[in-house]
């Protein structure tokens, strides 16, 4: 029996999309990447990829008459500081509608898409998928609307399963081209490899649910293989860690002993803590994370050191 499947990954030259695409290909599947290479997508994220690449924006274009066993929709504006509401809604919501319409027209039965923890805003933690959404920016709002669109589309097309994954604070290989939106792990690593003291807001005690990108790939595959019904699920570890812990891990893995430099926080509404409730993802998708913060940073530093030629 042939177990080889065909998958489409939109935003497949970006951080998370490229990791999904290369993992699926390594498992022996036929993978097509779609990316317009205008935002976070970069060809270097696809070095070694053997599949097809469609250079297009799914807000403006979707291929015709192509069948896929499933679609992973990762294409989006991910910069949470973008204030252009029209552009955000077009690139995130309207493009998603195009992907769903394409899936329905071509009888694709499963779509897995990137939602976000930004849908929760400053809601009570740990965040549960059923709690009210309170987005603090247009990015988070666009993801709330995507979740609404997915739910309604699945009701109208009951032979489709549409699963949203609310990514928390993701870090790992492939984020080099995200610029200011790269993770704090990546930014602190770069400060420290230059011999600078790592700079964090006073006093480094703000907590985030940091999740390694390999675990994000894992939950996408769990959604593919185990997800039976439409819905949204948290994609995280469920264990919040503070910035001081990141610095300690980096010092250990880089063989350094740099003290943090604590700076004033200019943001009056800066979140003190993010944390996901992972019960639903475990029960419905069979997902449990493989990487603690220590294990994730240890793995990541090896990749970063090789990338920068650091010994």
Residue ranges and their predicted role:
Residues 83-87, 138, 175-180, 272:
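Short, solvent-exposed loop/turn segments at secondary-structure boundaries
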Residues 148-208, 213-218, 222, 248-251:
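NAD(P)-dependent short-chain dehydrogenase/reductase
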Residues 89, 136-144, 179-186, 209-210, ...:
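Short-chain dehydrogenase/reductase
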Residues 126-133, 171, 262-263, 278-280:
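Short glycine/proline- and charge-enriched loop/turn segments
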Residues 1-166:
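N-terminal Rossmann-like NAD(P)+-binding domain of SDR-like oxidoreductases, especially those catalyzing
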Residues 193-311:
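C-terminal substrate-binding subdomain of Rossmann-fold SDR/epimerase-dehydratase oxidoreductases
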Residues 99, 150, 188, 281-282:
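Structural element of the ATP-grasp superfamily
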